[in-house]
């Protein structure tokens, strides 16, 4: 069996220590499906602040990041998952509102 995690981008801040000290240090593959909150039209204002930092934090951690805007972007999912498990590294897949609304 293989693991993955589903979370909102606001959880990135509280998972940094675990990502660095466990996942990356021990070469544990971990696909992260992340609902990307805080873009234009976000109804909850506090979500916007974390959206400003999400991609920069993932970049600083050297975690490959993919951003799904439309359903057709999910065609890349198998390749992304295979890369995570082959390379034994975490990957982040950001999914914005357009993706979930079927754009």
Predicted regions and their residues:
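Thiamine diphosphate
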Residues: 1-37
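Hydrophobic/aromatic beta-strand patches that form the interior of the parallel beta-sheet core
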Residues: 4, 31, 66, 91-93
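Fold-independent oxyanion-binding glycine-rich loops
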Residues: 7-9, 34-36, 61, 68-71, ...
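Glycine/aspartate-rich loop-and-adjacent alpha/beta segment that forms the canonical ThDP
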Residues: 13-15, 87-103
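Short, well-ordered, mixed-charge alpha-helical segments that flank or form enzyme active sites
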Residues: 14, 39-43, 74-77, 100-103
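Active-site-proximal loop->helix
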Residues: 15-26, 41-60
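Residue-level signal for alpha-helix termini/capping positions
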Residues: 24, 85-86
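Conserved thiamine diphosphate
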Residues: 46-80, 86
């Amino acid at each position: 069996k293989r693991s993955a995690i589903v979370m909102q981008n606001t959880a990135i801040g509280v998972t940094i220590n675990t990502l660095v000290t466990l996942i990356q240090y021990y070469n544990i593959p971990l696909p992260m499906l992340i609902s990307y909150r805080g873009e234009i039209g976000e109804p909850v204002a506090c979500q916007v602040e974390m959206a400003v930092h999400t991609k920069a934090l993932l970049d600083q951690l050297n975690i490959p990041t993919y951003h799904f805007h439309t359903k057709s972007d999910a065609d890349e999912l198998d390749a992304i998952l295979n890369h995570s498990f082959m390379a034994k590294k975490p990957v982040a897949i950001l999914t914005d509102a357009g993706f979930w609304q079927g754009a």
